[in-house]
Amino acid sequence: MMNRIELNSLNAIIDGIFLQLRDSNLSESENLSRIQVEQWIHQYRAYLIKQDLDKGRDINPSYIQTLGPLHISKVSTCGVPNGFHYISDKELPKFIDLHFGTGLVAVKDMHGNLIQVGNETKAKYQTSRKYTCNDYIAYLKNNHLYLNGPGFLEYVEIEGILEDPTKAADCYDYDGPYPIPANMIPTLKNLIFSKELNIMLTVPTDNTNNSTNDVKQ
């Protein structure tokens, strides 16, 4: 049985863009690579999501991907009473930048318990307070996940909104659901056609094969 390709998969979105170009008899599509179109899709997905969330709206679950299990290592006890500093062994892919912070949505231990997400400053003060010094807190720094808290963690899971969704796993499924709501895909395609392909189509070339300089800039 053949694998079913999701209508909102990355392959389906790329194929749809090329199909529309061919249907429009645009010869420039012959020189356009799938890699370039894919990068535009990631770029405008991030743009649309940022535009949506910077208005203060709730995060659409369709935006979110899960990373992990992610191994973390104890690095020191300095500044963490009764606990440790942890750091992820691997560098994390880039999360989108939002007005209120990063696209890091949630961190969980392997039992599904939520770990508070903050920043480095908040983590520093939390570990010095009487009633919160034994609570875990996680934050991003230099593309790694850092955690402060008791010495019982080894793996965590992360939920977040990545700039490039294909970086969420070593083997991304191009035929699986792409992390964007289906109703946002037409807007994403229109942005690519208007902002990118029109630029390509107006590159100075003489396609009329005549002696006049009638190329539009």
Predicted regions span which residues?
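Glycine-enriched, solvent-exposed interface loops adjoining structured elements
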Residues: 2-217
